[in-house]
Design a protein with these regions (language model features):
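Positively charged n-region of N-terminal signal peptides that target proteins for export
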Residues: 1-4
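C-terminal motif of bacterial Sec signal peptides marking the signal peptidase cleavage site
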Residues: 14-15
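Acidic, metal/ion-coordinating pockets
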Residues: 19-328
């Protein structure tokens, strides 16, 4: 049975307001403040897109297997490929290892190599890899995943073979259209599996994150974006820790926060700095992007687009989201 992603709503120009009734009154919106003046047309523009969890459960692996024993995922992304290709940077959470055979789904994921090839061919050009499944195949799985991502020249953040590699490549600096973006990535844990030295998984530790933010600032980025694997699974609202960390990250100098892990969509906020009037996007959870999960609200998620413009300053000019649904 094939698994394919469908766009439910394209280009929802709602300025990233959440439609969650329980949160509607507490969401700051950009509908009045992010109109696009003519002067912006001459400014440099960077379009980013974020999606949630790229997963491979056993049903998906079985469905992708061909008669020749290879795996074909092209049909999974055919309806979203155009949307992915419309942006400058498309960033996704790779929530599987590429640990080699035997290929397995939950609870210890190891996806076929062809899954990564399909992700790359769809247009995703940045991956974050720090999540609770990073160590599902131990040291060999972590290192093989990094090796394969590097073989396709896909920039990535979150897991590293050793401290030297982390120091060299982290924070991940993305340069596009004259912009410099520092990308950070952390996870709450790895399902109780301890990382094997010298490998490194970026865990959520405020002391370490604070240092990483300061290193990011030395790179003179136009924006610092933190991708956080956090929260409680299947909960439609962020918990206290998510709310605290989001505020703390912004206070420390992060410009935008993008969350994953709950497997369901959680609210989006746009916060305004009272001193600078800068706009900061907080997405508590993008939900799933592609999976075989059957629990309520886990069969889809968000694709969130944000547009940065730069003239005399860098600012969030617009944001919007599309809904995706996995047909199976």
């Amino acid at each position: 049975m094939r698994h394919a992603l469908f766009l439910m709503i394209l280009f929802l120009s709602l300025s990233c307001t959440s439609r969650s009734q329980a949160r509607r009154d507490s969401i700051n919106t950009l509908s009045d403040t992010l109109s696009t003046p003519d002067s912006i047309m001459s400014a440099d523009t960077l379009r980013l897109l974020f999606v949630g969890d790229l997963m491979q459960h056993q049903g998906q692996i079985n469905a992708a297997r061909t008669a020749t024993g290879t795996y074909d995922y092209s049909a999974c992304f055919e309806y979203v490929k155009e949307e992915i290709g419309s942006v400058d940077l498309a960033i996704a959470n790779l929530e599987v290892t590429l640990g080699g055979k035997p290929y397995k789904g939950y609870p210890a994921f190891s996806a076929p190599d062809e899954f990564l090839t399909a992700i790359h061919d769809t247009g995703f050009n940045v991956l974050v890899t720090a999540n609770n499944h990073s160590l599902d195949r131990g040291r060999s799985g972590l290192e093989r995943t990094i090796l394969l991502i590097d073989s396709l020249n896909i920039p990535h953040a979150g897991t590293y073979t050793n401290a030297e590699e982390r120091e060299k490549k982290y924070p991940l600096l993305l340069e596009k259209n004259g912009f410099r973006i520092a990308l950070l990535n952390y996870t709450y844990g790895t399902n109780g599996i301890a990382v094997t030295p010298p490998n490194i998984v970026n865990y959520i530790d405020t002391a370490i994150i604070a240092k990483d933010i300061e290193v990011s600032k030395t790179l003179h980025p136009d924006a610092i974006i933190a991708c956080m694997h956090w929260g409680i699974e299947y909960q439609s609202l962020p918990d206290k820790e998510q709310k605290f960390l989001a505020g703390w990250l912004l206070q420390k100098g992060v410009d935008h926060v993008i969350g994953s892990h709950p497997h369901v969509v959680q609210p989006i906020e746009v916060r305004t700095d009272s001193l600078t009037n800068d706009k900061h996007l907080v997405v508590y959870s993008l939900g799933n992007y592609i999976s075989n999960m059957s629990a309520r609200r886990t069969d889809g998620g968000l694709m969130v687009k944000m547009e940065l413009v730069k003239d005399s300053t860098v600012r969030l000019n617009n944001c919007e989201y599309s809904l995706v649904w996995t047909a199976r």
